[in-house]
Amino acid sequence: MFITLMKSKIHRATVTEANLDYVGSITIDEDLMEAADIMENEKVQVVDNNNGNRFETYVIKGERGSGMICLNGAAARLVHPGDLIIIISYGIFDREEAKTFNPKVVFVDEKNKIINIKSEEKHGEI
């Protein structure tokens, strides 16, 4: 049996752009993708802290070091520039691997620059 776990997340990233006319996806600064172990075209869940929207999309690379977090296509209607979002990736693990797996949690500042990376999440800690 397999179990789906959070593989990584980028916590409280600031939306820099929402581009309705693009084909679709979320564009993420390549530095953030690397830090969170998220691949191009990987499916992610996006949670908007400002309005409560949750949706899935796929990732495309943004310019390294730019801080870019841009929602494209239909997803652009679900967020606004300046919103704080959480970008979550998931992995499928067998139960033995799941017992020892440690996710990556990437914390960013208001300009989407990495300020900390942790391998666990505890209630009440940011």
From Swiss-Prot:
- Which transformation does this protein catalyse, written as a reaction? L-aspartate + H(+) = beta-alanine + CO2
Cofactor(s) listed: pyruvate
The source's superkingdom equals Bacteria
Pfam families xref list: Asp_decarbox
What's the top EC group for this one?
A: lyase
Q: What is its main location?
A: cytoplasm
Gene3D superfamilies xrefs:
2.40.40.20
Q: List the disulfide bonds.
A: none
Under SUPFAM superfamilies, the record lists: ADC-like
Q: How is it modified after translation?
A: Is synthesized initially as an inactive proenzyme, which is activated by self-cleavage at a specific serine bond to produce a beta-subunit with a hydroxyl group at its C-terminus and an alpha-subunit with a pyruvoyl group at its N-terminus.
Provide the cofactor note recorded for this chain's UniProt entry. Answer: Binds 1 pyruvoyl group covalently per subunit.
| A Gene Ontology molecular function term of the record | aspartate 1-decarboxylase activity
List the active-site residues. Answer: S25 (schiff-base intermediate with substrate), Y58 (proton donor)
Residues that coordinate or bind substrate: T57, G73, A74, A75
Compartment list: Cytoplasm
GO terms under cellular component = cytosol
Could you say which EC number(s) this protein's record lists?
4.1.1.11
Q: In which pathway does it act?
A: Cofactor biosynthesis; (R)-pantothenate biosynthesis; beta-alanine from L-aspartate: step 1/1
Family (UniProt): Belongs to the PanD family.
> What biological function has been recorded for the protein in this entry?
Catalyzes the pyruvoyl-dependent decarboxylation of aspartate to produce beta-alanine.
**Protein name from the UniProt record:** Aspartate 1-decarboxylase
